[in-house]
Amino acid sequence: DKGIAFIIGKTDGEMGLNLFSIFYSIGMHFINGPIYDERGKIIKYLPGSGTYTNCYMDITPCAVKIESAMEHAGITFVNSSFMSKVIVSPENYGPVKFVGCGFWGIQGLDYHGYLEGKGSVLFNACHFSGWDKNLKGYPCIYANNRDIFVNSCEFLNSEVNYPLIYLGPYVRNAIITFNISQSKFEVKNESFSGAEVIIKNNV
């Protein structure tokens, strides 16, 4: 419960398939990886990119932590399962995408997504179930990054009666459309005053 299952650094178009972990402190940890010169000396650290399909990070306080993703390529998860939350760090500049993924809660879970940084984060055709286990008022998705997209997702926690998504002051663009919730669909918008925010067609 103190280890990290997968540490991924400077990859360029990495393809991960059928990765699994359980009972680790972090399932997948994306970092700035070392770049070496011809003498084997580290000269700099750079983020990577890749697509990860059919991954299952089971029973963990943090399923995915992204410190940094390649700015022009990013990291994409497809048809994957995360039994807790994903964290995108303030240092991130690259796009992060979750497509057709499922999120489930564990005891004491707060958010399913805690997002910071200057990169974009997208959730498309995902479902969320079991955030804020102790009903303390945490949103499912805490977004305080530059760009956030939440589209065609399903929120299955019927016990909450407070906002599902929080938009913080560092948000510059947000598109939240065509989502379904078992409880009232509500977004708390505290984004930058000049932000472009579209919230519509949610039920």
Please state what every model-predicted region is.
Residues 1-203:
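Extracellular/periplasmic carbohydrate-active domains that bind, remodel
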